[in-house]
Amino acid sequence: MDRRNGGDPLAPPRPPKLLPRVHRPRAPEPTLSGVDHNAGATASALASGASSAAPVAIHNNNSQQQLSISAAASNNNTISIIPASPDFDDYQIHHLTFLPQRPSSLSRNSSTASSTTATGISVSGSGSVSGSSSSFTRRRPPAPVPLNNSISNNNNNSINNNFLSHFQSAEPASNALGQPPASPVTLAQPRPESERLTNEYVDTPLQHATRSQHPAGQQDNGQTTTHHLLLLPQRNQHLHLQQHQQHLQQQQQQQQQQQQQQHLQHQQNQQHARLATTTQATSVGSDHTDGLLHSHLQNSTTKPPASKQPAPPRLGMGLGLGLGLGLNQPIITKQPTPATQKERMHALEELLQPGGAGGNGGPLVMAGDPSLLNPIVCPRCGRCRCEQCQSPRPLPQTWVCNKTCLCSAESVIDYASCLCCAKALFYHCARDNDLDCDDGNGTPCVDNPCSCGPYKRTQRWGWLGALSIFLPCLWFYWPMRGCMKLCEKCYGRFAGRGCRCQGIGGGGAGSGGGVGSIGSTSSMLPIVPLGVNGSGLGGGVSLSGGVTDGGLNQANGKAMDHGCSAARSILRKGDLTPEKRLLDSSPDY
């Protein structure tokens, strides 16, 4: 059975394909003529050179490629053939495993190298035999040995035989004659481990090592095959990859836990920063800086926990422009996360609650966007603060008589007070240009003869006085209009959709100033400059009574005027709806 890697049926299996492919020329086909010739030459040399004739038995085993010569003499000497010159390889094989190397004298190609192989044996007088041989084996031979070696004694012979016995295998004599083995070697029935040779593709510097000395052979009592040894790097690499993957998984889990902790900490910091932005109060220095000023009745303000440092307040809408407020503030590089309206106004409601330690506390300068301080939805009642919702709702009206007559409060007053007759008289007696003149409110004077507009005011009121003599019900027109306004006010109080939060109970004006009453943020009055005395703030703002007592010392008039105008503009913008803010910021309006 030819395995196509040397022509020997006992050749080892091919190594796995993961090894680097090395070009190896094929060895010549084995012949039996060289063996017979070498055996005859050896026998003739021994017979002619020995002083005392002794029968010599030569056993040649071609299948195992070894030459064992035993002499039946009284001195028990053993003749060993040692190569004179080592064979060098023309290439270098990569070292994959540590395997013992078979000496070149045991090569299967040493006996069948070529027809030009010459074996010379010379027998010395002392009984030592030395020889030289050359072969074309592709295996790296052992280190060169000196030519003149004495014949070893029985101890050396036993050591050499034990070393060579590792590579020998007992085979029947039929294999020595070139006959095929009894049981063919197939893929289904592989060759026994005892009949296998070492892999000639593997080279190693360790010459006298056995398989049991290999790290893999220590686990299976030296029964590890060459194929298993070649797979050791793969096993080690697989274990290394598993350890690396486990290490990466642990690192990923640690990173995920750290990210979750950082995310929770970031959310907590944002919540504390929003509260601090709403509630933080900054004292007014000697440069008379002011902003959105709301005098409060409490001395203490809500503080965030001591472990978390509050974020610095954000300057919105140009607050404190040119007054030195933004010199020590860090640059804002990230937009804050929007919060609910109740969270934004939570701290403001605590400040506006009645009660406290008196009205001598310093004014509270609120920093930030005015829209956050004046939200469109009231944090108390949850209703809208826009002008349309806060304006009183008109009395209901409807169309009756198949939608031909409008039933409303004004129409009822017109018919009840006979004002409809006066309107009809003015309409028929008026000129064309009188229909285009209005009373200043966009309503023509013909439709509203009782208006106070400047157009023909004397004539209209004179004719109404003359008609009241014939129509005395005209005298009830103004009382009925007053009753209608009272009904509208009552209806708007109970049916209004907007915020109707009233002002907080006021505190009297003191030496430090105070607030009389503060209504909803939609009805704030413009802020007047702060009063400054020698000890600091000497005046406050009272929305009901004006500026409280306290000397107004304008040491820096320009800064005060500029700050006051900036505060007024911010207050006006904070009171507007988003649509009106857009119109206010447009240069066309």
UniProtKB/Swiss-Prot annotation:
InterPro entries: Sprouty, Sprouty_domain. Residues 104-135, 148-162, 239-272 have a biased composition (Low complexity). Belongs to the sprouty family. Disulfide bonds: none annotated. This is Protein sprouty. It holds the Pfam family Sprouty. It is found in: Cell membrane. It is a peripheral membrane protein. Induction: By the BNL-FGF pathway in the tracheal system and by the egf receptor pathway in the wing imaginal disk and the follicle cells of the ovary. Residues 163-172, 276-286 have a biased composition (Polar residues). Residues 1-37, 102-194, 239-320 are annotated as: Disordered. GO terms for biological process: animal organ development; branching involved in open tracheal system development; compound eye morphogenesis; dorsal/ventral axis specification, ovarian follicular epithelium; glial cell development; lamellocyte differentiation; muscle cell development; negative regulation of epidermal growth factor receptor signaling pathway. PANTHER family: PROTEIN SPROUTY, SPROUTY. Residues 380-499 form the SPR domain. Inhibitor of tracheal branching that restricts branch budding by antagonizing the BNL-FGF pathway (BNL: branchless, an fgf inducer of branching). Acts as an antagonist of EGFR-mediated signaling in the eye (where it is important for cell determination) midline glia, chordotonal organs, wing and ovarian follicle cells. In ovary, expressed from stage 7 of oogenesis in the posterior follicle cells and during stage 9 when the follicle cells migrate posteriorly over the oocyte nucleus, expression is seen in the dorsal and lateral cells and is excluded from the ventral cells. Once the migration of follicle cells is complete expressed in the dorsal-anterior corner of the egg chamber. Expressed in the embryonic tracheal system, developing eye imaginal disk, embryonic chordotonal organ precursors, midline glia and wing imaginal disk. Disruption phenotype: Pupal lethal. Mutant embryos and larvae show ectopic tracheal branching. Interacts with DRK and RasGAP1 proteins of the Ras pathway. It comes from Drosophila melanogaster (Fruit fly). The Cys-rich domain is responsible for the localization of the protein to the plasma membrane. Its main location: membrane. GO terms for cellular component: apical part of cell; cytoplasmic side of plasma membrane; cytosol; plasma membrane. It comes from the Eukaryota. Keywords: Cell membrane, Developmental protein, Membrane. Transmembrane segments: none annotated.
